[in-house]
Amino acid sequence: MKLLVTGAFTITAEQFDMLSSLGCEIMFQKDERGKPECDFSEADAVICNRLFLYHDISVFKNLKLIQLTSAGLDRVPIEEIKRRNIALFNARGVYSVPMAEFALSGVLSLYKHLNTFYESQKSHIWQKDRNLHELCGETIAIVGCGSVGTECAKRFSAFGTRVIAVDITKPKNEVYSDFYNIKDIKKALDIADVVVLTVPLTDETRNMFNKDMFSCFKENSVLVNISRGAVVNENDLINALESGKLSGAVLDVFKCEPLNADSKLWDIKNVIITPHNSFVSSKNNARLFSLVYDNIKNSMKGLV
């Protein structure tokens, strides 16, 4: 099997040897946007992230397997992959723990006014704040209860919160206190102190959180978006924040990345902005390689 590995996955010498021992002949494409550094038409399998945004899949004549380094499927030509019967794997579960920790830390930062204390520290000022909040007893709505959402639920639940699930189908995990079908999402938003978005980007979820949806949020609630930026209408979010409908937001993803320097979001009080970084962890490589190795091994055995 000829395996194309892009710069989206940093392969170690040990991992290279393990894949080679399976019978893989490994080719490299460091820059997914750049000109082909090898013959794409020879690749039987690909490990990538955004490769097919910059290179037409028709060039990959022999392609039988795609292993994405991302959890989302919005960067690949799904219909063509189905038509050609190409095995497609995402990185489900690989980034769930760091993303969940990130979501929780962001909310805690807002509730405990950590940014205020940080600014005081930089100026060498001893300034107390008597208006802090606690998570215990709050209601957390997780919109999208897959692997990331469920890991978020586990961590928020550990802080004594009531965690409710919002999804198409009811999750089997007992960490959720209640379930709302996505059709009834507005009922969930009305009672949630914190709303965490972990939904995939689809035609149905694009701009899902708009003016109409924000009007249903509980007063002074907090929005956390660690899914995809295009799920949220940013202008409507800005209005909801400036009007005081939302008391804060933790935003790791945006419709256009990098976020434009003149975006109002940068300067709104109680908004935490991070550069699509919530998934990062020193443990990701090992988790991802475990998936890669098993999927390629099974494919070569004809089990995929």
Q: What is each residue range found by the language model?
A:
Residues 1-87, 210:
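An N-terminal-biased, well-structured beta-alpha scaffold segment characteristic
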Residues 86, 91-139:
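Phosphate-binding beta-alpha-beta segment of Rossmann-like dinucleotide-binding domains, i.e.
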Residues 89-102, 116, 255-304:
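C-terminal helix-to-coil terminal segments
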